[in-house]
Amino acid sequence: MKNMYFKGSIVAGIGVAIALSGFQWGSAPKYKPRKTDPAQSAEGVMWWYKTMKANQITGEVDPADYYQAWNQVRKEKNSNKSLGLQWEEMGPWNVGGRTRAILIDKNNPNRMYAGSVTGGLFYSNDGGNTWNIYNAELNNTCISTICQTSNGRIFVGTGSTAEVNLAGNANSTGSVGGGIFEITGNGNFTWIVGPGATPPNNSTSVDWAFVNKLEAYGNRIYAATNKGLRVADPDNNGNYSNWFNPIYVSCTNSFQVTSDCKDVSVASDGTVAAAFGNKIYVSPNGNDNTFCTIYTVSGASRILVEFAPSDPNVLYYSATNTSGCLASIGISLDKGNTFDIIAQGGGSFDPYTLTPTQGGCQGWYDMSMAVYPNDPFKLLVGGIELFRWYKTQSNPVFGQWQKISSWTPQGNFNPYYVHADQHFIVFKDNNTAYFGTDGGVFRSSNLNDLNPTFVSLNFRYATAQFYSLGISSYINSNNGVDVIMGGTQDNGTQVMGLPNVFHPKYGFEISGGDGFDCDIATVSDVLFHTVYFGSLSRSSSSGASGTFFDSELSTACQNGCGPFYTCIRYWDTYYAPNTKDSVQVVLSNNVNPGDTIYYESSTNDIPLYFVATQSYNNGDTIKLPDYVQNKLAFANPIAGTIYLTRQAANFDKNPEWDRIAGSQSIPDAFSGTAVCMEFSKDGNHLFVGTSNGSVYRISNLMNAYDSATSDIRSSSCVLTCTRIGLFSGRAISGIAVDPNNPDNIVVVLGNYGNTNYVYRCINATSAPSSNNTSNFVNITNANLPKCPVYDAEIDMNDKNRIILGTDWGVYACSNGFTAVGPLVDWAPEKTGMGNVPVYEIRQQTLPWAPNAGVIYAATHGRGFFKTGSLVGIKEIEKNITNVEISQLNLFPNPANDVINIKIEGNQNSMAIVQIYDLKGALVKEASFNGLSKGIARMSMNVNELRSGSYIVKVVNGEQTFTRKLLIQH
C-alpha cells in the first residue's frame, strides 16, 4: 500500500475525512470602524435592556421586583450542592465601560474612585494609571455618583435616570440603584439610606431607586434623586438618618417638589442649585423652604447645573429638550436670578448630536459639564464629544465654542481621541481633568493649551459591557491566553489572545460600534463579528475582512437591516460522515485498492485522506468526500426570517445564503424577532428563541446541502420548522443544547416581574408543535433569584450540571435533568466574579482542545471570565465508565520510555492521543493519521514525563477512550 498526495478542488456532490488544523494568527486582523453614529447606539441599547429586563406586560422594571431579587442575593450563602466554580478574570484590561462617576480623594490626590453602571466601584492609588475592583458585591448597583465630605468620608450614589429610553422611562431599562452607601476602606462599605439600607418587602415605593448626583458642603450631603432633592446632616454619632426635602413649588406653597431631580451643585459659599425638568431652584444655604429663586429654561427636559469654583455668583446650566437635542446653555452672574444664553438650540452648534439640525440627539443619555477651577468664564461641556467655551464679551455675556476632542479615529495615534459619550467631568487642578465616558476613564493634563490632548486610563478598569461570547480551541503559545472574542456596548467587538498585543489581558477591537453575536471557526482561522442593525463581517489571519452577503442580502442590508441586536450562530466540524460535498481530485499516479490518497478540503486546505477501495489510473479525475463542514445562521435580515450559508469559513468564494425559516416554513410558519440561536452538536437542528416567547426547531439541516434543499422558497426544500414552545410573550434570552444528546435542551427567559425563568425539555428533536409550554418542565425553584436569566450551558461531562448567567451573576445546579422540576437545586457560583450581570456562557466541548471543558462567561460590566473547575481528573476518570475498557489496550503499564496503544475504532479516521497529569493539565499530545476501521495500533514516546500517575485519552472520530497510566523511570 502507498500514500499519495494530491491537490483538490470543491465540487457539489457527495461524501469526507479529517486531519487537524490549528487556529493560527500571524498578526492581528484588520480593524473595522464603527458604521453609524453613537446616537443609534444609545437609543438601541435602551431598547435591548427593555426587551430583556422589563416586564412583558407593563414595559417596566418595577423596583419592587428588582429589590426582591437583590434582597435574595444579599441573603444567599454558598450551598453544599454548588459546583464550587472558581472564576478567573480574563480582561480586557484596556477597555473601560460606561462610567458616570469619578472622585479624586481630597486628602490624597493619587487616590481615585470610579464607578461603572454595571461593573461596580473601582479605586486607584496612582492617579488612575492602575485600577482595582473595590468589592465585587457592588457589581450590579448602577453606580452613578460619588462625593466626599469635609471630614474625608466618601459616599456613593446608585441608580441613574439617565440610563433611560428615549421616552424618558428609567424603569424600562432596569437601571435601578439601592440608595447611598459609604465606603469605609479595605473593600468594606455600609448602606446609609435607601433600599440598600432598609430592604423593602415587595414595596411599590421607588424612593432612592435613582440617585443622579451627590454633592457635599462641609459634612452636609445633597442628593438629587428620582423623588426630589434630599438633604441630610450627620447627627452626633456621624449617622445620616434624618433626610429632608427642602424644595417647595414656591416659597409660599406647602407642596414639596417630588419629581425627578436631575442635578445639584453647591457653590463655594454654600449656595445650592437644583435642576428639575425645565426649572432651576436656587437657595442661599440649602435649608428647608429656602429655594425661592426659580428659573424656567424654555424647552428643557433635562438640565445640568454647575457653579464656578472660583466665583460663587457664576452659575451655568446646560439643557436638552425631549428629543435629547440642545435646548440652550446659559450663564448667570447673579446666582441664578438671570441668565445670558451662550448657546441656543436649533442651530449649527449642538454637543449632543453629530448632525445638528438633523436630529440623532442623545442629551437624555450623555451630558456633562465642569467649570475651570481658576477661571469662572471657561467651561467644558460633554455630549458625544467634548467642547470648551470661553467668554469673549460682557453685557450680555457671550463667548466662543471649540471642539477639543474627537471620538474617531480612535487609538493612541490620535492625541485628541476621547471615547464617544461624555457622562462626567472632574478637575484635579487648573490644567488637569478626568472624564467618564462610554469607554471608561480619560484624562487631559493640558486643558489650558489651544488643542488639549487626552489619554485613556483604563488599565485594569475592566468594566466592558459584553453582550456575547465566541470561543476557540486555540490558546496562544506566546502568552498562554485563550483566544476568545465578544461584542460589547459601544466598545466594538474585542478579541483576546492575539499575538503582538501589548499585554496578554488586553483586547483588540476588531470592529467598532456596538458588537453583538460573534463566533470563532474551528476549521479555519475565521472570526465572525456583528454590529447593530444586521451588520455582519468576517476576518481572517491573512488580513481579509468584510461582509460576505450574496446579492439578496446585500440589497436587504444595504442601509442596515434587522433589529438593533444582530443575532448569528456558527457551527462547524472536521468530520461530517454524511456530507454531501466532495472534492474533485486529478490523480497523478496509479492507485490500487488499499492505497491512501491524501488531499485537501475546500475549507482552509485542511488535509484529508481516503483509503481507495478500487483501482484508478494516472490522470483519472475522482470525487472524494469533503468531511469538513460549516454553517452560519443569520437572523432577521428580513423581518421574520433566518438565513444560512454553508460557505462562511471559505474565503475563496462568495457564500450563497438560503432562507431556512420564515412565513413559508412548514409545519409551522416562523415569525417574530430571533434573539438567540443554538445548533445541535451534529449540526442537524437549529433551535431559535424569539423576543416574544417562541421557541422553534429547524431540522434536517444535515440533508440540506444546496439552495434547492435548503431554501424554504424551493419546492424541493427538505427542512422543517416546528414551534415547540410559547412562553407568553416573554423574551427567550438563551438556549442550551446538551452536547451529548440534542434531545436535552434548556430554555431561559428574561423580564422582571415573573416567577419562572428556567425550563428543560427532554425530547427537543422530536417534540411536537405547541402553542404553550407543554413540551417543557419548569425547573426554577425558590433558590434562584426572580430576575432575568440571560443564558445557560449544559456541562459536557454531566447533563445534570447546568450553569446559568443571570442579572445577578452565575448560578448552577447538579441535578438539572434527574430531579423533579421544583427540586432542581440552584446555588450561586460567583467566587472571583461577584454579582455582575452575565449575558452569555459557553463551554469548550471539543474533547481534543487544550481548553476542553473550560467554561467562559461574558459579563455586562466586568469583561470576560473563565473557570476550569469542571475540568480535571474527576471528569477524565469518569469517561472510563463510558467506554468498553476492552476497546483500549495500553502497554506496557507501568511504562518507562514508550507506550503502545491499541484501539478498536468504528470508522476510518485519525486519532488524537492526549496525556493528562492528575491536576487535569494536558502534558503531551500527538495525532495519528490514516487509521482504518477496526484494530489500530500507535506508539508514543513518554520518556520526558516525570514518574507518576497520568490519564491517557484517545479521541478517534466520535469515540473517546480513556485509561490510567503509570510512569516509572
Regions found by a protein language model. Name each.
Residues M1-K32, S124, I873, I880-I885, ...:
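Bacterial Sec-dependent N-terminal signal peptides
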Residues I10, A101, V156, L966-I967:
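Sequence-pattern detector for short linear motifs
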Residues V11, D126, N285, D334, ...:
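Serine/proline-rich low-complexity intrinsically disordered segments, especially terminal tails, linkers
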Residues F23-L870:
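Beta-propeller blade termini and top-face loops
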Residues R98, A464, L469, G513, ...:
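Surface-exposed loop/turn and secondary-structure junction residues enriched for glycine/proline
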Residues E877-F891, A895-H969:
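C-terminal outer-membrane/trafficking sorting elements
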